[in-house]
Amino acid sequence: MFYHISLEHEILLHPRYFGPNLLNTVKQKLFTEVEGTCTGKYGFVIAVTTIDNIGAGVIQPGRGFVLYPVKYKAIVFRPFKGEVVDAVVTQVNKVGLFTEIGPMSCFISRHSIPSEMEFDPNSNPPCYKTVDEDVVIQQDDEIRLKIVGTRVDKNDIFAIGSLMDDYLGLVS
């Protein structure tokens, strides 16, 4: 799920950037340090939308660096258990499917793939397919899955998915 939330970040700035473009430098550094990162609490920061406040800088004693507190709003992606999402298959093997849901990795065990779909190691590329070959899931295909669990680390989120519900599977 995508959310638009308020966040805070501290920017450490080297003295060589002090000058007429100081605030623009702080903004650019915020974009490069924050966008594309993941915090376990809020999820993946997709994009900074607005910068609400750049606080007064605090000089670091003995270093000359300045620490600027910045308050901003961003769009974040935070998946939850039970959510149905579209994903791209990145790897197919006998234990299951590995997929990517935007910046997040997701694994679908062969036990969470419908029983009428069998792994075919002899096809090129390897795939899961039905007996009548009506449905074939292989690398780079787009599938719809249900998230059945997530593991949140400090800088990453990993999900476990399933194709065992109605309307899940290959997106045509």
From Swiss-Prot:
One of its GO terms (biological process) is positive regulation of translational initiation. GO terms for molecular function: single-stranded DNA binding; single-stranded RNA binding; translation initiation factor binding. It is found in: Nucleus. One of its GO terms (cellular component) is nucleus. CDD domains: RNAP_II_Rpb7_N, S1_RNAPII_Rpb7. SMART domains: S1. It comes from the Eukaryota. Belongs to the eukaryotic RPB7/RPC8 RNA polymerase subunit family. This is DNA-directed RNA polymerase II subunit RPB7. It comes from Danio rerio. The gene is polr2g.
